[in-house]
From Swiss-Prot:
Any GO MF annotation of the entry: serine-type endopeptidase activity
Top-level enzyme category: hydrolase
Annotated CDD domains: Peptidases_S8_PCSK9_ProteinaseK_like
Active site, UniProt feature: 174, 205, 365
PTM summary: N-glycosylated.
CC terms in the record's Gene Ontology section: ascospore wall; extracellular space; nuclear envelope
Organism: Saccharomyces cerevisiae (strain ATCC 204508 / S288c)
UniProt-recorded name of the protein: Subtilase-type proteinase RRT12
Upper classification of the organism: Eukaryota, Fungi, Dikarya, Ascomycota, Saccharomycotina
Protein family per UniProt: Belongs to the peptidase S8 family.
Main location: other
Glycosylation site residues: 38, 64, 106, 121, 268, 356, 449
InterPro entries: PCSK9_ProteinaseK-like, Peptidase_S8/S53_dom, Peptidase_S8/S53_dom_sf, Peptidase_S8_Asp-AS, Peptidase_S8_His-AS, Peptidase_S8_Ser-AS, Peptidase_S8_subtilisin-like, Peptidase_S8_subtilisin-rel
Length: 491
């Protein structure tokens, strides 16, 4: 369609415009779209484009468009996708104590310990959090169902002293970070705030996540730098355009600031939406720039194919397992998109409210930063960014989950995170392990339902389908309860 014809349609429909994300097929298509020789076209486009995005080979814009114009533009050979500027959410899983509260507080936090040196550059953190102890051993940790605190102070976290992520910048794309917390030891860098709330964390999710990446007590990488990329507000959500702007910032900061300072780059994405080609392609564009991206699989007990950015190519996608019973968490997404599972049930980390309390949360949002911390360690050891996913899988502990529990999770990898420390597992006297009813666990995993809010529910009528989602099935939109088999029918 000629630009002049599209321009007429634009003018007719201005009063009915709303904001859309537009992805172009390639950089050349973007250039042709924005620099057409027709003066009226260029002037109109310049006025309507709110933001331009350039992330690797990804090119996109946000534009105020009417629905009629969307139908016109989608026929353009230059345009790949058009979607409303939908909402992104911080992934949260089941709360620990109730279905109403996402947070459990622990007022007995302690931030003083001394690492103990062992042989061959191996250091251990005594009285370590359970999630850290689990990733530095191959076999199950003891757990007493009748006395959950019985083994609380028994565990050590082993790691290599010289490789703690000290030459790595970890970008935390989330709700912000409580940067003044002493656990971060002045290693937080204010990157960008896209929420207009200002830097800092008014939600808690981002601080908890950052603590699992690199805090002194709860972090896998004890000396990594943490870059605050605030794309989600105090309610834990934000626009997809914020996520795109955050990705663009990460690429620019990594290439122009981090690398000239000798720093390597890894990004943590403990957030997500329903499957979106625009988000996936933007993340893939950022990965082209040599940045490691680690993403949460999601908490809907579905194939992670249906979540973004979990389904993006070359992202390290993380599922959650329960390290109390060494079984995939009932809420965790699964499937061939998942690279690795990490502890994600009742995970303790920092609070955004004060220095003394900690938070206990569950979800793939908690599993993901633990993997991000290990990725930072591997980058410190000289592993190339494009090899990090392969190295994490190579080091993993395999065949931990009972095969019966994977029966309804086809092509799901049976491997959990291991940090690669070269030592034998600690023995424990008077060990107690839960006696598991595998049939009951398998049944619960199969039948567990999660409430899924699709990102387009505010923009689309029930049962409609958004143009550009060529691989998606038509679903009733809004708040719906979905089982794995509902999706498998359409695969």
């Amino acid at each position: 369609m000629k630009p002049q014809c599209i321009l007429i349609s634009l003018l007719v429909n201005l009063a009915y415009a709303e904001e859309y994300l537009v992805r172009f097929k390639n950089p050349t298509a973007f250039q042709q779209f924005t620099s057409n020789s027709n003066r009226s076209w260029r002037q109109f486009i310049d006025n309507k484009i709110e933001k331009k995005f350039s992330i690797g080979s990804f090119r996109g814009v946000t534009m105020n468009l009417s629905k009629n114009l969307v139908n016109k533009l989608k026929k353009s050979p230059l345009v790949a996708d058009i979607v409303p500027n939908f909402r992104f959410e911080a992934f949260e899983g089941d709360s620990v104590n109730s279905a109403e509260s996402s947070y459990t507080f622990n007022a007995t936090a302690k931030y003083s310990y001394e690492d103990v040196e062992e042989e061959q550059n191996i250091t251990y953190q005594p009285d370590a959090p359970r999630h850290l102890a689990r990733i530095s051993r191959h076999y199950q940790l003891p757990f007493d169902v009748g006395d959950k605190d019985r083994y609380k102070s028994w565990f050590n976290y082993y790691y290599e002293h010289d490789y703690q992520g000290q030459d790595v910048n970890a970008y935390i794309m989330d709700t912000g970070i409580f940067a003044d917390h002493p656990e971060f030891e002045d290693r937080v860098i204010q990157g960008i705030d896209l929420t207009k709330e200002g830097f800092g964390d008014q939600n808690g999710h981002g601080t908890h996540v950052a603590g699992l990446v690199g805090s002194k007590t709860y972090g896998a990488a004890k000396r990594v730098n943490l870059v605050e990329v605030k794309v989600l507000g105090k309610d834990g959500s934000g626009e997809a355009s914020n996520v795109l702007s955050g990705l663009e910032f990460i690429v620019e900061h990594c290439t122009k600031v981090s690398r000239p300072q000798g720093k390597k780059c890894v990004a943590n994405l403990s957030l997500g939406s329903f499957r979106s080609p625009i988000i996936n392609m933007a993340v893939e564009g950022a990965i082209e720039e040599g940045i490691v991206f680690v993403a949460a699989a999601g908490n809907f007990n579905l194939d992670a194919y249906w979540a973004s950015p979990a389904s993006a190519e070359n992202v390290i996608t993380v599922g959650a397992f329960d390290d109390h019973i060494d079984t995939i968490a009932k809420f965790s997404n699964w499937g061939p998109c998942v690279n690795i599972f990490a502890p994600g049930v009742e995970i303790e980390s920092l609070s955004h409210l004060n220095y003394n309390d900690t938070l206990i949360l569950s979800g793939t949002s908690m599993s993901t930063p633990i993997v991000t911390g290990v990725a930072a360690i591997l980058l410190s050891k000289g592993i190339e960014p494009e090899m990090i996913a392969q190295e994490i899988e190579y080091l993993s502990t395999r065949n931990v989950f009972h095969r019966r529990t994977l029966f309804f999770k086809p092509s799901t990898p049976n491997q959990i995170l291991y940090n690669g420390v070269d030592k034998l597992d600690d023995p424990y006297d008077d060990e107690t392990f839960p006696r598991l009813n595998i049939e009951a666990i398998a049944k619960e995993l199969e039948e567990y339902n999660a409430t899924l809010q699709t990102p387009m529910s505010e923009n689309l009528q029930s049962g409609s389908k958004l143009w550009g989602w060529n691989n998606d099935v038509t679903l009733p939109l809004g708040e719906i309860r979905l089982k794995r088999r509902d999706f498998m029918k359409n695969l």
